[in-house]
A protein has these predicted regions:
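Short S/T/G/P-rich N-terminal loop/turn motif that feeds into the first structured element of a domain
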Residues: 1-57, 61, 65-72, 99
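C-terminal structural segments of small proteins and small subunits
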Residues: 64-88
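Charge-dense polyanion-binding interfaces
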Residues: 85-99
Length: 99
């Protein structure tokens, strides 16, 4: 399965230092051992189209072999630390899980 998360950072966190800290936090998430592969991304510079949403600041795509592996990730201390450290940084977060 795939776990996709989109983050919109608060305006006051849109500076290079805070963005670097946020990227470090995301990269730490990828150390959870049930992850098969993971990617951190920013919006692509594609043409503006009515169906394309490029308003988010960061996205992650995390792949797991099983739903159980995903559940381990959700309850993992590394995930808990990320949420605790950064939950006040985002204005909005969206999760889209694919089977």
């Amino acid at each position: 399965m795939e776990h996709h998360v989109y983050f919109w950072l608060k305006e006051e966190k849109q500076n290079p230092e805070d963005r670097a800290k946020f990227e470090e936090g995301i990269d730490a998430l990828f150390r959870v051992d049930t992850i098969q592969s993971a990617l951190r991304a920013v919006p692509a510079k594609t043409a503006v189209r009515p169906v394309t949403d490029n308003s988010w600041d960061y996205a992650i795509n995390v792949k797991f072999a099983t739903l159980a592996d995903h559940d381990v990730y959700q309850d993992h201390p590394i995930h808990d630390v990320f949420v605790a450290d950064f939950k006040d940084w985002w204005a909005k977060v969206e999760v889209k899980d694919l089977a």
